[in-house]
Each structure stands twice: as structure tokens, then as C-alpha cells.
């Protein structure tokens, strides 16, 4: 079942030059992502530190969108929803809860959105952050041992027609 378009980029390096070649390809339903009709994903990356246990979709992109950027799901509960006719220019989205972006939204290059503080405000809880991350990386699963229970988080909602 075809659900959208994605641009793949190949970079060729010649001494003194860097040439980016973009190729339009089709995106099939995979990795818990639903993409609406006529949307283009360019320089698009999804990182799931922990996949949803029930395998349900966690990212929804509406129709007629142009989306670039990196989307990081730090735990199994995060969901990102993007409305129709939305542009995201190379941003970073880090989600443990919920990020909702309305329709007809324009987000400029280099914006970062986090629905969490990434680290607890309590020093006693942060003491293990580095060792927990290192342990997960050594096992090939970054974030596996991160304790999100004491990290403050709240949903982000960008309403229709916002411009950032």
C-alpha cells in the first residue's frame, strides 16, 4: 500500500566540491509512520529509541506536506501528528509524550522542539544519566536504560496557521 513520497539523498564528494543528488522514491507503510497523499519527506530521519510494544502507528503526517528533519522518539509512548499542507525545514523533534502540529504551519530551518526536559531536575536522579546512556550505546540500544519517570514532560501543540 503506497502512502507517500520520500526523497533519498546521495552525497558525492569531489575534491573542492560537495554535490547532493536527490531522488524521489516511494515510502511504504513501515516503522509506524503514516504519510498522507502528495507529501514529500526530504532529509527525513526517524529514530525510535524504544518501539511501541503494540506496534501501533506513532507518527502521522498529513497530505500535501514538505517535511525535513530528525524525529526522535525517546520511549515507547511518544506520538507526533502533523496536519495537512505543513512545511518543516530541517528541524529536530524529540518526543516522549506528544507533539501535535496543525495544518498550514510553517516551521523554519533549525528549530528544535522537545516535549520533555531530557534530564531530571533532581541531581540525585541525573547521577546515572551518563552511565545509563553509555551502557545502552555499548549494547547497541541507546536510551535503553534511561529512566524517564522523573523527567518533566508535557504535550506540545502548534495550532493551525502558525509560523515559527
Annotated model-derived regions:
Residues 1-161:
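Domain-scale signature associated with acetyltransferase and cell-envelope carbohydrate enzymes
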Residues 164:
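PRPP/pyrophosphate-binding module of the type I phosphoribosyltransferase fold
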Amino acid at each position: 500500500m503506497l502512502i507517500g513520497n520520500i526523497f533519498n539523498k546521495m552525497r558525492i564528494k569531489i575534491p573542492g566540491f560537495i554535490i547532493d543528488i536527490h531522488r524521489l522514491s516511494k515510502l511504504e507503510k513501515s516503522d509506524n509512520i503514516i504519510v498522507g497523499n502528495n507529501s514529500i519527506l526530504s532529509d527525513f530521519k526517524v529514530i525510535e529509541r524504544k518501539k511501541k510494544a503494540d506496534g501501533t502507528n506513532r507518527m502521522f503526517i498529513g497530505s500535501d506536506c514538505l517535511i525535513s528533519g530528525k524525529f526522535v522518539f525517546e520511549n515507547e509512548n511518544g506520538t507526533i501528528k502533523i496536519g495537512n499542507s505543513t512545511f518543516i525545514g530541517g528541524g529536530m523533534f524529540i518526543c516522549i509524550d506528544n507533539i501535535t502540529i496543525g495544518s498550514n504551519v510553517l516551521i523554519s530551518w533549525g528549530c528544535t522542539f522537545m516535549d520533555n526536559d531530557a534530564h531530571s531536575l533532581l541531581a540525585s536522579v541525573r547521577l546515572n544519566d551518563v552511565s545509563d546512556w553509555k551502557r545502552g550505546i555499548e549494547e547497541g540500544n541507546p536510551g535503553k536504560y534511561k529512566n524517564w519517570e522523573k523527567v518533566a514532560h508535557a504535550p506540545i501543540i502548534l495550532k493551525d496557521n502558525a509560523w515559527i
